[in-house]
Amino acid sequence: MATKVLDSWALIAFFEDEPAAGEVEKILQRAADDKHKLLLSVVNWGEIYYNTMREVSPEAAEQKARDLAALPIDIVGVGDDLALARQAAIFKATHKMSYADCFAAALAKLKNAELLTGDPEFKALEKAIKIAWLK
């Protein structure tokens, strides 16, 4: 079973019914049908939470957390071995990207997985990781 990593961009597009929402919905359905495994870094989970809290309300952020928990996505923590944090730090030191995006990219690299995003910030990493561009 192939493993894919979601960036917060993909999930925000899904929740906000942006143009890529249908594509993300199909990806989520394939994961629910055990066609592939979906991963999300806990840092990107936090990015979705704080953006919702900041832009809408604390209650909306809690609802979004419940909505995320209901999706067929495994949340990956940073853990004690520091490999994920180290790779994210390397990406941050060598590319002009947000630190949260560096965690999504690092997770994709460490899991040899495809990153699903539409965020142009990841163009700098096209040679370092596999990226599926959502539109």
Role assignments for model-derived ranges:
Residues 32, 69, 109:
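Anion (oxyanion) recognition and catalysis
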Residues 7, 47, 101, 119:
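Acidic active-site catalytic centers that drive phospho-/nucleotidyl reactions
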Residues 11-12, 45, 122-123:
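A generic structural signal for short hydrophobic patches within well-formed alpha-helices
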